[in-house]
Amino acid sequence: MDSELKGQQLSDAEWCVKKINGEGNCLLLFLPMSSPTTIVMIVLVSLERLVPYVFKLSQTQLSQQCQSQGFTDSISLNLIKLKLMDILQAPQEINQIGLVDSNLVFSFDVSADITVSINSVPSHVTKDMFYMILQSLCMLLLKLVNLSTQYHYVQRDILNEKQKCLDFLLISLRDLDGGSKVISQWAPENSKNYESLQQCTDDDIIKKLLHKGKFQHQEFLADSLKTLLSLRNKFQDVSRFEESGELNKKERVRFPAVNHFYNDDFELQADPTNEARPNSRGKIKPKTDFKPKSRESSTSSQLRLENFSESEATPEKTKSSSSLVEEYPQKKRKFGKVRIKN
């Protein structure tokens, strides 16, 4: 087994799908290496033959290729190497990649105006490396199948809940005057809308899949792999985000609940700013601009008290009004009756 390549590196690495001239759609893997002779190892597996190829790039080769393209100073060389290490984590940023005289050549942007082309040479694939790469691919495909299946289960549950809501709304709409006419106008029989209103089963999905065409074609396989790999990356990003959120919960600023400062009638009980800054009240000088407003508030409060006393002094009016309400009760409109059919 090549001591430079380890199984853990393959399992943790980021696979991507690229179209390579002469090989068609391929799975690619870029690995940073800590070997004194190799800084980058590239694994290429054709989807047609499932035969792995390995390409290597040394520090000396990288320096010579950069110098031949005009990057001679050490600052530029270090910048290109750092950018190359970033590309290994996000191989989708590679502009072009292809086979040229058995070498794997790829290019990437160092800046908006500068592009660097790198030429990696083929390396012998030992028997142990061959099986290690294929084993890693099998584990990757199993994980993608499991992720796709779990995603399908969650999506099916969501669609079932939405179908129940749609059925309830249809029943409620048919129960209203003119509701059936609205449905028939929007979704007449044998129309696309009418078909969308019907419940969909697994058999219906399989029939649509069969009528879709040659879904087992190589292009469809490559597109499916791209979709699943993208879904896996999103899942990992969300998982890392939630884990970091759980770790940072203790460091977040917690605001007090509304009921801490307000009672059930939403009347202010305590000023939170004054509690936080007990000595700030003496530093604030009152402004004369707000005096008329305080008089207005006192006058309005006095009027409210007078109105309240008048309402207490006229109980007969309230009694007569309540009797009128009892004599002429309001009619309630029945709406949205649901029919249950056995």
Swiss-Prot record:
Consequence recorded when altering residue 17 to I: In strain: DBVPG1135, DBVPG1373, DBVPG1378, DBVPG1788, DBVPG1794, DBVPG1853, DBVPG3051, DBVPG6044, DBVPG6763, DBVPG6765, SK1, Y55 and YPS128
A GO biological-process term: double-strand break repair via single-strand annealing
InterPro entries: NHEJ_factor
Subcellular location: Cytoplasm; Nucleus membrane
Region (Disordered): 270-342
Basic residues composition-biased segments: 331-342
Annotated phenotype, changing residue 204 to G: In strain: DBVPG6044 and Y55
Keywords for this protein: Cytoplasm, DNA damage, DNA repair, Membrane, Nucleus, Transmembrane, Transmembrane helix
Membrane topology type: Multi-pass membrane protein
Annotated effect of mutating residue 231 to F: In strain: DBVPG1135, DBVPG1373, DBVPG1378, DBVPG1788, DBVPG1794, DBVPG1853, DBVPG3051, DBVPG6763, DBVPG6765 and SK1
Effect of residue 105 to A: In strain: YPS128
Similarity field: Belongs to the XRCC4-XLF family. XLF subfamily.
Miscellaneous field: Present with 377 molecules/cell in log phase SD medium.
Protein name per the record: Non-homologous end-joining protein 1
